[in-house]
């Protein structure tokens, strides 16, 4: 709802469906949003028919019985075949085989660099762990850091998972040595003043202004850089996406993905209209 084109999008949907759609903006704070949606669904609140949920909510809610199965109405076989089958099975199919979500968005946690800083310190590529470490050392100092992040408690897992993947670990198996190596690497960046410890309080709202101010030489971020574009900082000679480095040395590169799904509240009194939407 914060997108400047949202009102136009909503009008197009209403014109196409003939529906009168009342929109309630979700809380922007992730904890508050999770609590609100959980309360609505768990109490059988029928005031909201369709909710757009993220991956965390999908994992929490898919076996709760709070969401309507959509196999025979929206997510029919011809529609299901258009999506990655592993994603459908793992993220939006409940224990009884009911598909409870309609994918509406997917994105990825891309690696970004500040090209001005790279040029300044003479780093031409960040392809390996060794390249990354050289950049950290060269770019850090005088209030600037080679790497920046958003490590607030509800955000930190994104980058933890990303570094674990880059080292060839498994976020779901903490017996693996690669996982511990990744966490040690992140701690070493803090100890070496290559990334700031105070970012444990930062969400993206706090991180992005620092990026635009040239405080960070590299970082991971979702989306296409809208905040950087608005600040005049997006471009091949400024802030831009780059290939994620191969830390494992095995030629493997990995990124974290995310998604949003439309779900139908099983308590809804307007299921026919919701399915039309």
What residue spans do the PLM features occupy?
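Conserved N-terminal structural module of periplasmic/extracytoplasmic solute-binding proteins
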Residues: 1-66, 76-81, 125, 233, ...
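Extracytoplasmic/periplasmic substrate-recognition and gating elements
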Residues: 16, 25, 120, 192-194, ...
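Loop/turn elements at helix/coil->beta-strand transitions in domains of secreted/extracellular proteins
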Residues: 17-21, 44-49, 98, 140-145, ...
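Short helices/loops that flank or line small-molecule/ion binding pockets
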Residues: 34-46, 64, 117-118, 134-138, ...
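Beta->alpha turn/N-cap motifs
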Residues: 53-57, 204, 220-226, 259-260
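Hinge/lid segment of periplasmic solute-binding proteins
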Residues: 55-109, 133, 159, 236-244
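Short glycine- and hydrophobic/aromatic-rich loop-to-beta-strand nucleating segment
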Residues: 109-113, 262-264
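Glycine-centered hinge/linker elements that transmit conformational signals in sensory
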Residues: 133-140, 172-200, 244
């Amino acid at each position: 709802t914060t997108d400047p084109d949202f009102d136009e999008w909503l009008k197009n949907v209403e014109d196409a469906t003939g529906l009168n759609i009342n929109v309630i903006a979700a809380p922007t704070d992730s904890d508050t949003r999770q609590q609100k949606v959980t309360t609505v669904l768990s109490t059988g609140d029928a005031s909201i028919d369709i909710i757009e949920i993220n991956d965390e909510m999908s994992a929490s809610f898919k076996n709760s019985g709070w969401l309507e199965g959509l196999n025979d109405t929206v997510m029919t076989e011809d529609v299901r075949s258009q999506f990655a089958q592993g994603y459908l099975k793992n993220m939006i199919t409940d224990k009884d085989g009911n598909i409870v979500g309609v994918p509406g968005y997917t994105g990825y946690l891309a690696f970004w660099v500040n090209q001005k800083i790279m040029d300044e310190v003479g780093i031409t590529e960040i392809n390996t762990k060794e390249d990354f470490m050289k950049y950290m050392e060269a770019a850090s100092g005088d209030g600037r850091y080679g790497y920046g992040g958003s490590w607030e408690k509800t955000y930190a897992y994104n980058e933890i998972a990303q570094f674990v993947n880059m080292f060839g670990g498994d976020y779901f198996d903490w017996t693996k040595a690669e996982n511990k190596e990744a966490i040690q690497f992140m701690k070493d960046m803090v100890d070496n003043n290559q990334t700031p410890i105070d970012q444990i309080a930062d969400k993206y709202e706090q991180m992005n202004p620092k990026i635009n101010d040239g405080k960070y030489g590299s970082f991971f971020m979702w989306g296409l850089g809208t905040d950087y574009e608005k600040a005049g900082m997006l471009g091949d000679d400024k802030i831009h996406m780059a290939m994620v480095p191969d830390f494992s040395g095995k030629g493997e590169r990995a990124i974290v993905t995310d998604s949003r799904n439309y779900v139908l509240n099983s308590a809804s009194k307007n299921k026919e209209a919701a399915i039309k939407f």
